[in-house]
Amino acid sequence: MLFLGPHACEEALVRGELHSLWIAPAAWGRVARLVADARNAGVVLRREPMEALDRKAQGQRHQGVLGEGGAFAYAAIEDLEASLRARGDAALFLALDGVTDPHNLGAILRSAAGAGVDGVILPERRSAAVNETVIRASAGTAGRVPVCRVVNLGRALDGLKEAGAWIYGLAAGEGSRSYLDEPFDRPTVLVLGAEGEGLHLKIRERCDGLLHIPMPGGIESLNVSAAAAVALFRVLARRGPHGA
């Protein structure tokens, strides 16, 4: 996996995922701390011309710094269930049903990391995987939150429900109530669907309740990454300083 830009490389180094670091001469002085930390960690350092980094990144922005490492380390669903039991009513998870755009996924993971989410669940099918584009879009923060890929999202939600979670689907329409009215005072899983399609029926049926974000301006909906950020930080606001 490639880590594009200094922030993504710093995060990968902290997680122990960085194997080699390519730095263009013009960027060397700007990342002296990263170079020192990487050298201390035994990471292979390579001073390469900008053209070499451009070829390696295949047109993606890298700011003169590019890292190589292993595949993204996904969490197991059992780890998330254990975290739920340990955190009790403060537990907060995010499940994504059919979010295929890597830029949206990266933005969502950045918000999830900022909100201190206990885990993000993705289906293996009909979903973007965590790759270089996602890590770049997350500003390098994708590894700060446990991300789990599952064969069957519905079964994963069933397992979290059995462990004590309350499943909320973010969806407008009949039977949905405003998220402003929900106290979020129990272990919570927020489920968001793809833009345009929304939640699939089998996922919708597994939800304990449906919530929507009011739109007084008259637009139909928010971008899925914006909706995720709004919903996550609403949960934190409702719980107060001791509920996160």
Model-flagged regions — what are they?
Residues 103-107, 199, 224:
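Short glycine/serine/threonine-rich phosphate/pyrophosphate-binding segments
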Residues 114, 119, 136-141, 201-244:
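Structured adenosyl-cofactor binding patch, chiefly the S-adenosyl-L-methionine
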Residues 168-223:
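Active-site/ligand-binding-proximal alpha/beta "capping" segment
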Residues 26-28, 50-51, 125-127, 195-197, ...:
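Short, acidic/turn-prone active-site loops that include or flank metal/cofactor-
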Residues 1-86:
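N-terminal positively charged helical leader segments and presequences
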Residues 30, 127-133, 197-206:
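Short, glycine/polar-rich helix-capping loops at beta-to-alpha or helix-loop-helix junctions
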Residues 7-11, 17, 23, 33, ...:
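RNA substrate-binding interface of SAM-dependent RNA methyltransferases
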Residues 39, 63-66, 136-141, 185-188:
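Short, hinge-like loop/turn segments at secondary-structure boundaries
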